[in-house]
Amino acid sequence: MTGNNPTDRSKVGTKRHILTDKQGIPLSAIISSASTHDIKAVTDVIDNTVIKRTFVSKPKRGKRQRRKYHHLCLDRAYNSKSTENEIINRGYVPHIPYKRKRGQVRKKVHQKQYDSVRNKRWVVERTNSWHNRFRKLYIRYEKKVENYLGLVQLSYSIIIYRKIVLGEALNLR
């Protein structure tokens, strides 16, 4: 008799999938198991956004309305044609670095694309750092996903309060 399939990657733990604005303020959060691939959660994160964005700009004097483009920077784990199409259908312009295969040499075109996304990726990593400062959430003790998601949303509301109301994000102090 054989054991578990070694390729099922049944990891223990959870992943936080978050969507932030360019200042790092969280707009959407989803919790999934650690073995879930990132591609499966990207559409849920975009659809779960609390603040809906406008895709048509206000007309300036003497000019007509123009379509606004919202850019979505993702890491290499989200690189697939189906993911790009889903993001485009939801009104975003995807910026996903090229995912090269082992043994391939990185082309200069792909290196520039990777650098441009990597330069914006630190905003999300900083938001994860803000989240990890909450001691109750750094290690997950809750058994139910609903309880943990509620604590994550509470922590994000505290982050939003600190950054917007107290003026930390706008450097008003």
Show which residues each predicted segment covers:
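Polybasic low-complexity intrinsically disordered regions
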Residues: 1-90, 98-99, 155, 169, ...
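A general lysine-centric signal
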Residues: 15, 143-144
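Active-site phosphate/pyrophosphate-handling residues
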Residues: 40, 128, 149
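Helix-centered, glycine/charged polyanion-binding patches within enzymatic domains
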Residues: 55-143
